[in-house]
């Protein structure tokens, strides 16, 4: 097995970070973000073969009003050799297919009832176990769930106390 450190990994040349500059008002900024992200997602669907990282899927879905586009990407992009990775601080406000259609899910501690209820959208697992474990996680612990394939797996990280 080859070991690599961060200073040995070569930079990738084909990365794109979409960052919309602040406008005069919040409303103008949100409008500009909505247009830029909608155009980017449409281009990704046409071009195929992308890996898309959406850092705050709740913001994209709710604030920018792109729930339909996010749902489409999560449900359809794998059929065109593309991957969607969604990050979110609050699972309660994600479209249902974001969790239900995920192959890999990483969860950190949550005690919010709405977030815990949303975890039942993860396919192929016992939601009550995940909800209970998610409440009791320590500061640096997380739950990893592989929800696709012939069987589902749930792993809880262990950190030294």
Regions found by a protein language model. Give the residues of each.
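Walker A/P-loop NTP-binding active-site region of P-loop NTPases
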Residues: 1-11
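Flexible, charged surface loops at secondary-structure boundaries
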Residues: 9-14, 43-48, 136-138
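P-loop NTPase motor core of the ASCE superfamily
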Residues: 72-74, 104-106, 116-161
């Amino acid at each position: 097995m080859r070991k690599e450190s961060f200073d040995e990994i070569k930079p990738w040349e084909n990365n794109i970070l979409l960052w919309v500059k602040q406008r005069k008002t919040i409303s103008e900024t949100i409008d500009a973000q909505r247009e830029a992200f909608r155009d980017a997602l449409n281009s990704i669907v046409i071009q195929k073969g992308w890996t898309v990282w959406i850092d705050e899927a709740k913001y994209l879905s709710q604030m920018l009003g792109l729930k339909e586009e996010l749902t489409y990407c999560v449900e359809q992009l794998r059929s065109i050799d593309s991957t969607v990775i969604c990050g979110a601080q609050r699972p309660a406000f994600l479209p249902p297919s974001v969790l239900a259609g995920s192959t890999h899910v990483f969860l950190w501690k949550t005690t919010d009832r709405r977030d815990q209820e949303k975890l039942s959208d993860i396919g192929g697992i016992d939601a009550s176990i995940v909800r209970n474990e998610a409440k009791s996680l320590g500061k640096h612990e997380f739950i990893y769930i592989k929800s696709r394939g012939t069987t589902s797996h749930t792993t809880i990280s262990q950190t030294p106390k």
